[in-house]
Amino acid sequence: GSSKAALDSAMKFCALELAPNIRVNSIMPGMINTSLIKNRSAFSSEQLANDIKKYPLGRYGETDDISSGVIFLLSAASKWITGQTLVIDGGRTLL
């Protein structure tokens, strides 16, 4: 939506302004298995089953899926990456 677009623009602006000494990137996660999902108080089993079908990898993400992306962006392996959004969504945005 528009709030994600605004955050993306702000991230890119910061990446340009703070370069070359500071790298700025963002992460756009898909649905993450949290207590909200696990307790199923917010969604019915049918709603969850229908939503999971929208994920090519067949499941919601786990917190370690996101933390792995954070670790990558903080590591030297990403030293030439700035102004980028790392999409970690199990392929959801492909559909």
PLM regions and their residue ranges:
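Active-site helix of classical SDR
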Residues: 3, 11
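A conserved structural motif in NAD(P)-dependent oxidoreductases
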Residues: 55-66
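Short, small/polar-rich loop/turn modules that mediate ligand/substrate recognition or access, typified
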Residues: 19-23, 81-83
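A short C-terminal helix-loop "cap" of Rossmann-like NAD(P)-dependent dehydrogenase/epimerase domains
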Residues: 41-55
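Short, flexible catalytic-loop segment of classical short-chain dehydrogenase/reductase
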Residues: 28-39
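A short hydrophobic alpha-helix cap/turn motif
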Residues: 16-20, 32, 61, 74
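Non-catalytic, hydrophobic alpha-helical segments
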Residues: 66-67, 73
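Short C-terminal tail/terminal secondary-structure segment
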Residues: 71, 82-95
